[in-house]
């Protein structure tokens, strides 16, 4: 595979397969990204937890495989916490254990149950708990546990899915080993596929610390907005036992095709809530022609809740740490391997605004605002290969403001659009051809220019 599809700014393993992010946690100055990984091949299989660390969420260092599959079980998705109070007894108060909970998937009959492993050396080596599994319903579809410390009850809270039933189950524990069922949520919202990778967490509304809402993320496959994989969210109140949703309508985390299984970091300083997703879609993940690696993560995104037109919405924006990788300002026609395009678009004249980003071999994609349909869009028709897929992905702009903001992060093989304060997001993989690939941008003919625009080069990760 030629290097023009290398992930650059985005994390991928040096070799072999990667899908869901797992065990996201901040500890002792480092962000830990564990991930579903096949250590031996460039296809799904031999599921283990890979491991990478970063001090700034952008520049990652891959470490050896953390939790490996064995002869009896694969290590499916899960999460990690630091047991500061040593509730589990795995560590000490002076050296608390990092504890992972994961789905143990039995090879011979696909039985799934929740299991623990712990580390006393900051996630480098792990011991599987001898009392596993810690939660077993005798089911073949019961997975993806996400743990957190619930301050309202001073206990551990697990969010886990029953995929075929389209249900999220909540469990409580005092010691991480013994779990009691609290309640279930669902079916609700989008239910045309398996539910996976849930995540429940609190956020301030409009940065007001006196007003807290809880967000529940649920990935779904198939049944996503544009076919294949997608992620929906619900907002509501958590009373220590159950989530009471404000409504059960479908709200999409992302309007593109390539952001799935996203979950958030535990223990990020200053109560920030940061999400990373798998930048792919199960409809074509195995056919994406990269080697010796396959699988890329989205840029980390900070999540917030903001009120627009009386409705509370989940917003996602690139983490502020990305600013440290921004280079010189560029003009139309200038070239850079990776770009940030930040613009203010006017809606008052009733005219469209369209940007075109072109690779040096002639392939291109377009994004912008279509005035006729009142949508923010990405069109990758001319930046794709023969893999079957939809190409135009859009989000309807319903605001009445005369202008709105839009930011595009153009990677080596992707675009991530953040618009209207991050409430409308589109993530798409791209094929921008060219062995020595660079990109330039222009404002499409027949469209009005933006009110303002700033384009910067982004320093690649590697």
Ranges and model annotations:
Residues 207-209, 235-462:
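Beta-rich accessory regions
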Residues 1-145, 149-195, 204-255, 279-329, ...:
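Beta-rich carbohydrate-recognition and catalytic domains
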């Amino acid at each position: 595979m030629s290097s023009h599809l290398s992930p650059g700014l985005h994390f991928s393993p040096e070799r072999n397969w990667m899908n869901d992010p797992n065990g996201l946690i901040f500890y002792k100055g480092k962000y830990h990204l564990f991930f579903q990984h096949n250590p031996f091949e460039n296809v799904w299989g031999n599921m283990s937890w890979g491991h990478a660390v970063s001090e700034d969420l952008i520049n990652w260092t891959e470490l050896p495989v953390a939790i490996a599959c064995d002869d009896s079980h694969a290590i499916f998705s899960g999460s990690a916490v630091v047991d500061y109070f040593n509730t589990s007894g795995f560590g000490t108060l002076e050296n608390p254990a990092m504890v992972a909970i994961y789905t143990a998937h039995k090879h011979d009959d696909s039985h799934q149950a929740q299991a623990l492993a712990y580390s006393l050396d900051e996630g480098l080596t792990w011991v599987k708990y001898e009392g596993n599994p810690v939660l077993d319903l005798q089911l073949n579809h019961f997975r993806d546990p996400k743990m957190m410390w619930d301050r309202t009850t001073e206990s551990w809270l697990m969010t886990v899915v029953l995929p075929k039933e389209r249900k999220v189950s909540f469990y409580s524990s005092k010691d991480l080993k013994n779990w009691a069922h609290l309640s279930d949520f669902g079916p609700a919202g989008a239910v045309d596929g398996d539910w996976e990778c849930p995540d429940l967490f609190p956020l301030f509304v409009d940065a007001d610390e006196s007003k807290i809402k809880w967000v529940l993320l649920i990935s779904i496959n198939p049944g996503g907005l544009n076919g294949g994989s997608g992620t929906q969210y619900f907002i509501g109140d958590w009373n220590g036992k159950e989530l009471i949703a404000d409504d059960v309508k479908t709200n999409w985390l992302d309007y593109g095709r390539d952001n799935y299984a996203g979950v958030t970091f535990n223990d990020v300083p200053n109560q920030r809530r940061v999400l990373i997703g798998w930048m792919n879609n199960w409809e074509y993940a195995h056919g994406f022609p990269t080697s010796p690696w396959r699988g890329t993560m989205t840029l980390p995104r900070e999540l917030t809740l903001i009120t627009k037109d009386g409705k509370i919405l989940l917003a996602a924006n690139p983490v502020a740490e990305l600013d440290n990788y921004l280079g010189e300002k560029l003009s139309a026609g200038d070239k850079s391997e990776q770009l940030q395009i930040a613009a203010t678009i006017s809606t008052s004249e009733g005219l469209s605004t369209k940007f075109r980003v072109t690779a040096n071999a002639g392939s291109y994609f377009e994004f912008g605002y279509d005035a006729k349909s009142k949508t923010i869009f990405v069109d990758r028709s001319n930046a794709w290969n023969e893999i079957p897929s939809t190409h135009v992905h859009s989000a309807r702009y319903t605001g009445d403001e005369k202008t709105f903001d839009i930011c595009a992060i153009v990677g080596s093989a992707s675009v991530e659009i953040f618009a209207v304060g991050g409430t409308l997001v589109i993530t798409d993989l791209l094929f921008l051809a060219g062995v020595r690939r660079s990109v330039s941008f222009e404002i499409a003919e027949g469209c009005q220019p933006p009110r303002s625009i700033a384009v910067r080069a982004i320093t690649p990760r590697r």
